From Swiss-Prot:
GO CC annotations on file: COPI-coated vesicle; COPII-coated ER to Golgi transport vesicle; endoplasmic reticulum; Golgi apparatus; Golgi membrane
Record gene name: rer1
Coiled coil: none
Protein location: Membrane
Organism lineage: Eukaryota, Fungi, Dikarya, Ascomycota, Taphrinomycotina
GO biological process: endoplasmic reticulum to Golgi vesicle-mediated transport; intracellular protein transport; protein retention in ER lumen; retrograde vesicle-mediated transport, Golgi to endoplasmic reticulum
Membrane-crossing residue ranges in chain numbering: 34-54, 56-76, 137-157
Keyword Membrane on entry: yes
Protein family per UniProt: Belongs to the RER1 family.
Protein known as: Protein rer1
Keyword tags: Membrane, Transmembrane, Transmembrane helix
InterPro entries: Rer1
PANTHER family: PROTEIN RER1
Membrane-topology descriptor: Multi-pass membrane protein
Amino acid sequence: MEFIQRHIENVKEKKNFAVRLYRHWVDRTIPYTTYRWLTVSGLIALFFIRILLVRGWYIVCYTLAIYLLNLFLAFLTPKFDPSVEQAMKDEEIEEGVLPTSKDDEFRPFIRRLPEFKFWYSSMRATLFALVASFFRIFDVPVFWPILVVYYLVLSFFCFRRQIQHMLKYRYVPFDIGKKKFGSH
């Protein structure tokens, strides 16, 4: 019995060491944003080339594309929805509460899905899809042009809604052209 407990403890220690080592290497990639995204882009390109060459696993490809679209929309969406804030302001006006802030007050754009989590989830999903494309069980026969049309229609409606939301509440989720302070 003591031997089994020591063996279980040894396995747990090795697992914890492997998890810590994995987290260490993932955490070391944080400052290298460009290289991280180039790696994910390369993996996605490799996956799509594989799908085109083997002419199969279209469901896996469609699932990955939908998941990446969902992640991207969460990346573009603010953490605190301005429509909810606007409804609360309207309710305060009706109740007669004194204003506590100005409309022109600076409010930083905080994403619902931070960039690192977006990258990490994209990387894991792409690796999972790449591995799944090697197993015949995931090669479900489907007419792929329908999946492409579904994806394009879904993307169109999602992006249209997101752009309308951005225009209505006047926020820009990108920091291109904004001043950067610090050691950048």
